[in-house]
Amino acid sequence: MEFRQPNATALSDPLNWNVAAEALKGSHLEEVKKMVKDYRKGTVQLGGETLTIGQVAAVASGGPTVELSEEARGGVKASSDWVMESMNRDTDTYGITTGFGSSSRRRTDQGAALQKELIRYLNAGIFATGNEDDDRSNTLPRPATRAAMLIRVNTLLQGYSGIRFEILEAITTLLNCKITPLLPLRGTITASGDLVPLSYIAGFLIGRPNSRSVGPSGEILTALEAFKLAGVSSFFELRPKEGLALVNGTAVGSALASTVLYDANILVVFSEVASAMFAEVMQGKPEFTDHLTHKLKHHPGQIEAAAIMEHILDGSSYVKEALHLHKIDPLQKPKQDRYALRTSPQWLGPQIEVIRAATKMIEREINSVNDNPLIDVSRNKAIHGGNFQGTPIGVAMDNTRLALASIGKLMFAQFTELVNDFYNNGLPSNLSGGRNPSLDYGLKGAEVAMASYCSELQFLANPVTNHVESASQHNQDVNSLGLISSRTTAEAVVILKLMSTTYLVALCQAFDLRHLEEILKKAVNEVVSHTAKSVLAIEPFRKHDDILGVVNREYVFSYVDDPSSLTNPLMQKLRHVLFDKALAEPEGETDTVFRKIGAFEAELKFLLPKEVERVRTEYENGTFNVANRIKKCRSYPLYRFVRNELETRLLTGEDVRSPGEDFDKVFRAISQGKLIDPLFECLKEWNGAPISIC
């Protein structure tokens, strides 16, 4: 992505709207795939204008090596030389000869001492917690600090900041040696940049005695120990403007925003696929994805969400079976699915657009020059402005957080339908997988946890940026709160990962229960058919389609826990069918028919429990001969990931294993990025367009 344009382009697009629009071409999914590709590259080349969210997230995680473009050296040196020459000319420039902020009326000719004092007074953060067991809770997480170092170097490489190239090389060396200065978690309003946290990077570079860092193995190092380990020869004596160049920028807020958006983009794609999986396992009607509906609404996010769901559902074995079931009994479920399923593209579409727009906004920010003053060597002047105002970060993060909360709300609505036997089209209550529902409450605890997660997520959706307080003696009277909003959004991402984990395990549980349902129903059909033939060997029961129709229409989990009970729904409905047929017979044959009904029920009462137990045992041992339909679906890679790669299985009350143990496995894998490949595999055949309606 290019941000500094040649003159011809600048003249044709002076407001940069065309460049911004160009960046939105293509699908969101392709953009996310590119983001992941950037993340997985082994090297990040910094030149000042082409840094991506994926690269920032990668460096944050400690992955690639960072290299500086030699082409940037000349511009960086020119701005640094200009500062020194301006001092010699007695040019009055903010932060070089003046005090800072509301104290800019003050003057000094001791430029180096001024920078040293700047770093000293900005080292105002608090690391202490008063709790020895939690001694890092007031420290910015290491990944965010690494990302901030990268972004600050990228900004300074553009040659408008008056800093030596050697300082940028030193920061890069520290990054590549996995040495990370400790920064305070709080204390910045991201206006005049992230002054307080960035001052600790500057303090580390000049060897301040209070500076500490985390080494490659997690050990705490002093600045001296770290420099020796990295092979950096000595601390820096800051020249005029260099301290200000290091601290006066939005790097910390945009760093955390970048890592947040990397995860958020993946989670929104997951929510699209998960909604399609929900439709599959709920025996939903796929017409909600029909392209005409979404084409007429015009919103690109909605159209893409529907197209992705349509792709997952196209050819799905569950969808084919559901169509068959709907034909057998059109009144078994509502004509239209509920909103959490039917309007999921309309719900997710705006969230996709918001997160995509936020991603572009932050990507522009991390490639921007955002300090003050800016050194314009070509015009031989310093320009005093306010690019340090991190409003794009605060606004983008507030919007992202609201989108994440909406995604979580949809996920919760789908989850609560899935575990409720009044809504889930025949699955057991709480998705209980055991033999005795009175001793197996399945995901009941998980539903409570999901309510908790969702409530917290909705609370976090409240905006941060409207809580501005005036600072620096009313010099910073409006400020972005960019890092605070980024931190809050990072919390929201964690909670949405918890929800995604719980929901994905629940979907896999539901798919397995559909499989068990199919095996059990087949076995019950065979028992009822055999018994009807052997016991009801009189007219009108030689053709027993009506009897099997009852079996096919009745939800198997409504009776399978106690199949021998004469009061279970299956037995009652079979009895009604037989009574109706018996009463329709000539008067002389009625008594014989009624005697057959009793024998029929007695035989079922004897055979069904044995057959149900045999099927359950075979299912548990994996010796059944009915394939799981999920293997014939495009959503299978996610199921395989949870069941095979992470070694989870159907949860039952008979197993000592708790749901939380499986949730831990899945959450850890999601946090490690292992969800990405199976997620993309679900969509590997999608051509980026809806199925044609012509």
From Swiss-Prot:
Q: Could you tell me which Gene3D superfamilies the record lists for this protein?
A: Fumarase/aspartase (Central domain), Fumarase/aspartase (N-terminal domain), Phenylalanine ammonia-lyase 1, domain 3
**EC no.?**
4.3.1.24
Q: Which reaction does it catalyse?
A: L-phenylalanine = (E)-cinnamate + NH4(+)
Compartment annotation:
Cytoplasm
Q: How does activity depend on temperature?
A: Optimum temperature is 31 degrees Celsius.
PTM annotation: Contains an active site 4-methylidene-imidazol-5-one (MIO), which is formed autocatalytically by cyclization and dehydration of residues Ala-Ser-Gly.
User: Per the record's keyword annotation, is Cytoplasm included, yes or no?
Assistant: yes
Annotated SUPFAM superfamilies: L-aspartase-like (SSF48557)
Cross-link named 5-imidazolinone (Ala-Gly), sites: 191-193
Q: Which domain of life is it from?
A: Eukaryota
Q: One cellular component GO annotation, for this chain's record?
A: cytoplasm
Q: In which pathway does it act?
A: Phenylpropanoid metabolism; trans-cinnamate biosynthesis; trans-cinnamate from L-phenylalanine: step 1/1
Task: Tell me which residues bind (E)-cinnamate.
Answer: 248, 336, 342, 372, 444, 475
Protein family membership: Belongs to the PAL/histidase family.
**NCBIfam families attached to this UniProt entry:** phe_am_lyase
Q: What does this protein do?
A: This is a key enzyme of plant metabolism catalyzing the first reaction in the biosynthesis from L-phenylalanine of a wide variety of natural products based on the phenylpropane skeleton.
Subunit (UniProt)? Homotetramer.
Name the UniProt record assigns to this protein:
Phenylalanine ammonia-lyase 3
Which organism's genome codes for this protein? Arabidopsis thaliana (Mouse-ear cress)
Which lineage do the record's taxonomy fields give for this organism? Eukaryota, Viridiplantae, Streptophyta, Embryophyta, Tracheophyta
Gene of this entry: PAL3
